[in-house]
Amino acid sequence: MRCTCQSLRKSVYIRAQSIWHSLPLRSQAKQKVKNAVFRLLISTVGWSPDYQRRQKADAGTDSFRGMEFETPTGLVPAIPEGTADKSCAPLLQAEALKNKPAKLICFYLPQFHTIPENNAWWGDGFTEWTNVKPARPQFAGHHQPHVPGELGYYNLCDPAVQRRQVELAKCFGIEGFCFYFYWFGGKRLLDAPIENYLNDRSLDLPFCLCWANENWSRRWDGLDSDILIAQKHCPEDDLAFISWISRYLDDRRYIRIKGKPLLLVYRPNLLPSAKETATRWRRWCRERGIGEIFLAYTQSFEKVDPTRYGFDAAVEFPPNNSAPPDITDQVEPLNNRFAGRVFDWRVFIERSRCYRKPSYKLFRGVCPSWDNTARRQHRSVVFLNSSPQGYLQWLSNAITDTCKRFSDPDERLVFINAWNEWAESAYLEPDLRHGYAYLEATRLALAASALTVQTEQSNPTNRQ
């Protein structure tokens, strides 16, 4: 009898799905109907796969609840009591990692201080925090706003902030920051934190630059819509740019690959001729005594062989360019204005278990989470179901894959998006919800991957 009921349910479910998909309604209208059905007919539809997925999404996937963590010596908890949720990982004590299997480099956003241009475009006192603080949930189970932990709503012009960032990064196994560098035909924006970092030799964490060579627009996406400040790409600008940043390339802390300073470009396809730009930069650096440079680009909008641009490598930049599964119809909007898109973050874990071997030099990238509601409000892009445990698995897989593909330690790089992209919910810095869980997951991933690599190296049959 039970089998008969289950078969009947399955048949009804399949038929209902077919009718549902054929309804001539817009997605928002269909979502309202589905929400009403789930709310009013729970006893009838509670067994359905759609309803079960909804419940799972609302409950979240935080696997760190109840876990114990060990963290580096010399740090003390600074999260106020009573402000963190039950999944918050405290800051305990443990020895710092040695002999790390790969170098982890975090993208670093410098927009946490005021500049005249932002004051004019967005209002007096604007920083990244201006968008982060008022962010609100857009659907059931949506976590907003994101509230910082021990570092607070910091100002990057405060030297103590960068010192603490460096301490945290080093203690949890991060090998370097990749600063976004904003250059518009000789006009530099948001460069005060980078200048301060360069001038303060006590900040001993290695660093490199990524030229964010897009236009700035009011949409926060680099597209040509209501441009605030535009790029001025030309041969003269190529030379002016490399001349200016040479002061960073010369610094002893600057990240190098086989002795070559590492320079990233966010979108080389926006250059009139990326190959010609690369040639100019390489020639200029040779003639000025810097020597050879290592050029890489982020796969933010494209996935092509870097040699097409005259570059040496590409860097994965999730969640961009990832074609994840869309689960927008599985969430329950909290207001009628919600027109965003929701994706399932867990797809990255699954894909990382069996990476495709690239045909060119590619550095893996991971992101702890992603949600740009702070910038786009009801038109945001949200990746649901991220968790510290899931991030740990993804990062571990990325490190293991990197060690298999690169024998030279200099090329064993994994990029993390990001250290402090708070308006995109992509950060490792401690917050009130998870505490130090993402930082601790980073350290655990390094430790787990080191053990995996050692085991495979000791067993020749596992080598590829």
What is each model feature region?
Residues M1-E81, L92:
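Membrane-proximal basic amphipathic "stem/tether" segments
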Residues G60-Q464:
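Glycan-processing catalytic domains of CAZymes
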